[in-house]
Protein backbone atom coordinates (compact mmCIF):
# COMPACT_ATOMS: atom_id res chain seq x y z
CA UNK A 1 0.00 0.00 0.00
CA UNK A 2 1.36 3.42 -0.90
CA UNK A 3 1.97 6.13 1.66
CA UNK A 4 -0.83 8.20 0.13
CA UNK A 5 -3.31 5.32 0.37
CA UNK A 6 -2.26 4.65 3.94
CA UNK A 7 -2.71 8.34 4.78
CA UNK A 8 -6.18 8.29 3.17
CA UNK A 9 -7.18 5.30 5.31
CA UNK A 10 -5.77 6.97 8.41
CA UNK A 11 -7.80 10.08 7.59
CA UNK A 12 -10.99 8.02 7.16
CA UNK A 13 -10.42 6.26 10.47
CA UNK A 14 -9.69 9.61 12.13
CA UNK A 15 -12.95 11.05 10.79
CA UNK A 16 -14.81 8.00 12.08
CA UNK A 17 -13.24 8.36 15.54
CA UNK A 18 -14.13 12.06 15.69
CA UNK A 19 -17.72 11.47 14.60
CA UNK A 20 -18.09 8.55 16.99
CA UNK A 21 -17.05 10.85 19.84
CA UNK A 22 -19.59 13.46 18.68
CA UNK A 23 -22.32 10.82 18.51
CA UNK A 24 -21.52 9.74 22.05
CA UNK A 25 -21.84 13.35 23.21
CA UNK A 26 -25.03 14.07 21.27
CA UNK A 27 -24.57 14.96 17.62
CA UNK A 28 -26.23 17.62 15.51
CA UNK A 29 -28.26 16.71 12.43
CA UNK A 30 -25.30 17.73 10.26
CA UNK A 31 -22.98 15.42 12.22
CA UNK A 32 -25.47 12.57 11.91
CA UNK A 33 -25.59 13.12 8.14
CA UNK A 34 -21.79 13.23 7.96
CA UNK A 35 -21.52 10.01 9.96
CA UNK A 36 -24.07 8.31 7.72
CA UNK A 37 -22.14 9.36 4.60
CA UNK A 38 -18.86 8.21 6.11
CA UNK A 39 -20.25 4.69 6.58
CA UNK A 40 -20.28 4.13 2.82
CA UNK A 41 -16.74 5.49 2.46
CA UNK A 42 -15.54 3.14 5.20
CA UNK A 43 -17.25 0.19 3.52
CA UNK A 44 -15.75 1.07 0.15
CA UNK A 45 -12.31 1.30 1.78
CA UNK A 46 -12.88 -2.07 3.49
CA UNK A 47 -12.38 -0.52 6.94
CA UNK A 48 -14.87 -2.84 8.61
CA UNK A 49 -13.77 -2.35 12.22
CA UNK A 50 -14.17 1.43 11.98
CA UNK A 51 -17.42 0.92 10.03
CA UNK A 52 -18.85 -1.34 12.74
CA UNK A 53 -17.87 1.02 15.54
CA UNK A 54 -19.33 4.09 13.85
CA UNK A 55 -22.48 2.22 12.81
CA UNK A 56 -22.95 1.04 16.40
CA UNK A 57 -23.03 4.62 17.66
CA UNK A 58 -25.06 5.88 14.73
CA UNK A 59 -27.59 3.08 15.32
CA UNK A 60 -28.04 4.32 18.86
CA UNK A 61 -28.87 7.80 17.57
CA UNK A 62 -30.98 6.64 14.60
CA UNK A 63 -32.23 3.13 15.45
CA UNK A 64 -34.77 3.03 12.61
CA UNK A 65 -32.31 3.92 9.83
CA UNK A 66 -32.32 0.80 7.64
CA UNK A 67 -29.24 1.88 5.66
CA UNK A 68 -27.18 2.24 8.84
CA UNK A 69 -28.38 -1.09 10.22
CA UNK A 70 -27.60 -2.87 6.96
CA UNK A 71 -24.08 -1.46 6.75
CA UNK A 72 -23.57 -2.38 10.40
CA UNK A 73 -24.56 -5.96 9.63
CA UNK A 74 -22.28 -6.02 6.59
CA UNK A 75 -19.34 -4.93 8.75
CA UNK A 76 -20.18 -7.69 11.24
CA UNK A 77 -20.23 -10.28 8.45
CA UNK A 78 -16.89 -9.09 7.09
CA UNK A 79 -15.41 -9.49 10.56
CA UNK A 80 -16.77 -13.02 10.92
CA UNK A 81 -19.44 -12.08 13.48
CA UNK A 82 -22.11 -13.96 11.60
CA UNK A 83 -24.72 -14.64 14.27
CA UNK A 84 -24.56 -11.02 15.44
CA UNK A 85 -25.12 -9.92 11.84
CA UNK A 86 -28.05 -12.32 11.49
CA UNK A 87 -29.55 -10.87 14.68
CA UNK A 88 -29.35 -7.38 13.16
CA UNK A 89 -30.62 -8.41 9.72
CA UNK A 90 -33.61 -10.62 10.58
CA UNK A 91 -35.72 -7.91 12.23
CA UNK A 92 -34.57 -5.39 9.63
CA UNK A 93 -35.67 -7.57 6.71
CA UNK A 94 -38.94 -8.40 8.47
CA UNK A 95 -39.97 -4.78 9.12
CA UNK A 96 -39.16 -3.32 5.69
CA UNK A 97 -41.73 -3.50 2.88
CA UNK A 98 -41.00 -5.92 0.04
CA UNK A 99 -40.27 -3.16 -2.50
CA UNK A 100 -37.75 -1.34 -0.32
CA UNK A 101 -34.20 -1.60 -1.73
CA UNK A 102 -32.82 -1.98 1.80
CA UNK A 103 -35.11 -4.98 2.32
CA UNK A 104 -33.57 -6.66 -0.71
CA UNK A 105 -30.05 -5.82 0.52
CA UNK A 106 -30.83 -7.12 4.01
CA UNK A 107 -32.28 -10.35 2.62
CA UNK A 108 -29.23 -10.85 0.42
CA UNK A 109 -26.88 -10.31 3.35
CA UNK A 110 -28.92 -12.75 5.43
CA UNK A 111 -28.41 -15.37 2.74
CA UNK A 112 -24.70 -14.61 2.67
CA UNK A 113 -24.41 -14.90 6.46
CA UNK A 114 -26.33 -18.19 6.62
CA UNK A 115 -24.28 -19.58 3.73
CA UNK A 116 -21.05 -18.70 5.55
CA UNK A 117 -22.33 -20.33 8.75
CA UNK A 118 -23.05 -23.46 6.72
CA UNK A 119 -19.60 -23.50 5.13
CA UNK A 120 -17.94 -22.89 8.49
CA UNK A 121 -19.78 -25.86 10.02
CA UNK A 122 -17.66 -29.00 10.19
CA UNK A 123 -20.48 -31.55 9.93
CA UNK A 124 -22.69 -30.74 6.95
CA UNK A 125 -25.04 -33.71 7.39
Give the label of every model feature segment.
Residues 1-10, 14-17, 26-40, 62-78, ...:
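Amphipathic alpha-helical repeat scaffolds of TPR domains
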Residues 41-45:
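Short, charge-rich amphipathic interface segments used for partner binding and complex assembly
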Residues 56, 60, 90-97:
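Amphipathic alpha-helical segments of tetratricopeptide repeats
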Amino acid sequence: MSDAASADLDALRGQADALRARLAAGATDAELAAARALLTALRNARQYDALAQLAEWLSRATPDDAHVRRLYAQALIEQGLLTAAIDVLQPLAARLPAGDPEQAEATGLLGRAFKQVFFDTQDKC
